[in-house]
Regions:
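Interdomain motor-coupling "hinge/lid" segment immediately C-terminal to the ATP-binding subdomain
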Residues: 120-122, 127-230
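Conserved catalytic segments around the Walker B and adjacent sensor/switch elements
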Residues: 44-59
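Hydrophobic anchor at the beta1->P-loop junction of P-loop NTPases
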Residues: 23
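Short glycine-rich substrate-engagement loop in P-loop NTPases that contacts/grips substrate
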Residues: 55-84
Length: 404
């Protein structure tokens, strides 16, 4: 089993502190396994004498814990018997529990209780939790495997990021259960389609009280097809009208918000790099698991390769803690403006640069930016084409770098 070290390192400083540790992310991205790994880390290296309570609220045998107050009473009973020993509470998919916010906050306030929860909806951290915890939580967002993690899981012989592994990653995506399927493409598609259906029904339609699931599915597939391209809700409405499925812009916007909350995809805003202001139109969406997109949209692993490389780079930047926008510099576009703790990096992403014209296009937008922050062009070209103060990197090499 692959240890998700990056996330454990993020959690470790908060173990035992008076904050709820909240792990969020798309369904089946490995939150439950990470929760177990955190428990193992505490038991082995932090507090071997600790008492551990683990409840998965999606499992049928734990259905009694969904009722108001049952988890609270159960944990307090264990804490009372534990005397001076710390009780570590791990609640999986906590949003299914009645009045979970009150229970979690009450347990957090107990001196000898340390609380960890998971959820598959970003709204877990909005009004629901924030109003109760008033800042007493830390959020760790989990994504499917990065390319580096995929290589570690895939390679028994120690190969790192070669052509075969990268093609597999492009084809299958990073959902951790793919490892249990021996990375077989012939059966991975069925699994990913089932995961998609589960997300659509449980995390989007049910939560948003959506009855027209067919319309929802059409909108999601449109977004997945256009991942990495700018488009508007109005363009989706026009597309649906041609498909004889008319709907309003407000409906599309509502459905997109719900899908974003369920981590199906991420919305990225555009930024004017001259006036340094966020633009209100033409956002982009990136798909949380590109393997799921491939099996839903169709085609082989190289279909829409420019879009998918951009997709990979976006999520890698997010994993590394960067806040990412799309840059606009006059009539040109910069794929990513990444900001972190006062640092700014600029990135252009493309498949290959076989001609001078292509190189001029990719480097040209970066050259117009009137500052001296680091600038990068990422492509699959094996030859270093760095020029004019702009660093060129191979995409695979970038994805395999230590977090920077």
């Amino acid at each position: 089993m692959l240890v998700r070290s990056r996330y454990i390192e993020k959690i470790r400083p908060f173990v035992g502190l008076d904050v709820v540790k909240v792990i969020t992310g798309i369904r089946r991205s490995g939150k439950s396994v990470l929760l177990q790994q955190i428990q193992d880390e505490i038991a082995q290296n932090v507090d071997p004498a600790g008492v551990f309570v683990r409840i998965n609220l999606e499992e049928e045998e734990n259905s009694r814990f969904l009722s108001k107050g049952v988890v609270h009473a159960h944990v307090l009973n264990i804490a009372k018997k534990s005397r001076d020993r710390k009780v570590y509470v791990f609640l999986d998919e906590v949003h299914d529990m009645e009045d979970w916010e009150i229970t979690v906050n009450s347990l957090r306030a107990k001196k000898n209780v340390d609380v960890y929860i998971t959820g598959s909806n970003s709204k877990l951290l909005s009004g629901e939790l924030a109003s109760c915890l008033t800042g007493r939580y830390v959020d760790i967002q989990v994504t499917p495997f990065s390319f580096a993690e995929f290589c570690e899981a895939y390679n028994a012989d120690g190969k790192r990021g070669d052509d075969e592994v990268f093609r597999k990653y492009l084809a299958l995506g990073g959902m951790p259960f793919i490892t249990n399927l021996a990375f077989r493409e012939d059966i991975a598609g069925s699994y990913l389609e089932d995961v998609f259906s589960s997300i659509l029904l449980k995390d989007v339609a049910r939560r948003g009280k959506i009855r027209d699931v067919d319309l929802l599915g059409r909108i999601v597939r449109y977004v997945m097809t256009e991942a990495g391209h700018t488009f508007s809700a109005a363009s989706i409405v026009r597309y649906l009208k041609k498909e004889k499925r008319p709907c309003t812009v407000d409906t599309v916007l509502n459905y997109l918000d719900l899908c974003e909350q369920a981590f199906l995809f991420a919305r990225v805003k555009r930024e004017d790099l001259i006036g340094r202001r966020i633009l209100a139109v033409d956002e982009k969406f990136y798909v949380t698991d590109h393997g799921m997109r491939r099996f839903l949209v169709g085609g082989d692993a190289m279909r829409d390769i420019d879009q998918m490389l951009e997709n990979l780079v976006y999520f890698e930047l997010v994993r590394r803690g960067w806040h990412v926008t799309i840059g606009k510099i006059r009539s040109k576009e910069v794929d990513f403006v990444a900001e972190r703790n006062g640092e700014i990096n600029y990135y252009q992403v493309t498949y290959l640069m076989p001609s001078k014209e292509t190189r001029n296009r990719e480097f040209g937008a970066l050259l117009e930016i009137p500052d001296n922050h680091p600038k990068f062009v990422l492509s699959m070209d094996p030859v270093d084409m760095s020029a004019d103060g702009i660093t060129h990197l191979n995409v695979r090499d970038f994805l395999m770098q230590e977090s920077k």
